[in-house]
Structures are given as structure tokens and as C-alpha cells.
Amino acid sequence: PDYRKAVYEWVKQDADVKLAHSVIATPGGSGAVSMSIETFLDAGDTLIIPDIAWGNYALMASVNNIDVERYHMFEEDHFNLCSVKETIQKVMLKQDHICMIINDPCHNPTGYSLTKEEWKELIAFLNEVSKTHSVVLLNDIAYIDYSYQLSTSRDYMETFNDISDNVMIVVEFSCSKALTSYGLRCGGAVILAQKEEAVREAEIFMEKKARATWSNIPNAAMSNFVWIVTEG
């Protein structure tokens, strides 16, 4: 419980996030992302990712027989929301649920961070999509603690408060990056939704998935993180 609370507080920090939430301990950020993909998509489904991305997103999908559809990340010097919309609308034609990855802030490998206005526009569109399709947004924040604007790096999370009841956000956190402790394999999946029952349903499934896959993550890694963020 101490670790899960510490992860949630570290992830949101001063951001005024008012959503129901829970945290699943994972072996690094990669464990959080892979478990989320496996939880919210079935074989034959399609995962939406950026065209410029960490290669393991596609690999994680592939080993689970999940297809990948890529949106163009940039339009000149800004986030290409038009391509995101077109890609989601394409996937909507073949399945009744949407799962997409946004690697932000400090996108790997470009370093780009969406503006708060870009996040507002994205959330507004996902709410429209959610009128007919359930939506899960995987927000990979592996490099958030390397932001040039560290003091405001979590501000965008306040836009999450506007999600509809049919949208869920899972924030994928990596202690491996935040504390440069790669070998300890420590991270978390922070589940966010408007309703407690939606969070609990996802939490139960992800707990079972974790138990069946890696059982538990190292206690030393969890204890180390709690000590650093509370007493270190």
C-alpha cells in the first residue's frame, strides 16, 4: 500500500487530478505498458501508436497477435491531431473499443511534449469517440522527470478530469527512468476513470494478469522508491 500511494503521489505531484484511481505495481514502465495492452485488447484487435515510437510498443502488440495502426505524430512543428482523429476513425470501423498510446511528456525519441491545449483538444475528441466506442488511453510517462519544465510537467494531467464515463486513462510510470535504477525493474500502472467501479474492474483484471505473469516485483525496489520520495 505504501508503494502504490507513493507512486500515485509522485506521478501526479501538484496536478489537481480528481478522478477515481488505483495503482498496479509493475516491473518497470515496460511491464505497465505490456500489461495494459494485454488487458484492454484481444488477439485480432488493433492498437494505435505514433509513427515515431519506441519499437517495443509494436513488439508487445505482435506477441499478443494484436495489430498496429500508426498515426503521424507531427504536422510541421506541432502534434498532428488530425492524423490521430483519422487513425482512430479508421479503427472504429472494425472494432467497438479504442486503445491508443501517447508517449508524453518527453516523447521517445523526439523529446516533444504536447501543450496543455493539445491535450485539451485530444481529450475532447476522445470524449466524442466514447459516445459509441469505449476508449482507453495509455499515457507512457517514462521520461517525464527529464522535462525541461519539470515544475509544470504534470499540469496537463488536469485535463484528464474532463474525460467521459466511457474513457479510461492508464498512466504508465517507470522508476527505472525516474531513479535511473534500470536493473531493479520497478514501475506502475496508474488507472484513472470517472467511476470507482470502472477502476476496480480494471484493477482486478490487471492484478490477476500480474499474478499470472510475474507474481510480484522486487520488494527492495518498492521500498527504495518509497524511502526516496518520502524520506530521502
Predicted segments — roles?
Residues L47, V135-L137, I169:
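Hydrophobic/aromatic residues located in beta-strands of well-ordered beta-sheets
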Residues D140-I141:
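Walker B catalytic acidic pair
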Residues N161-G232:
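Conserved core segment of the aminotransferase class I/II
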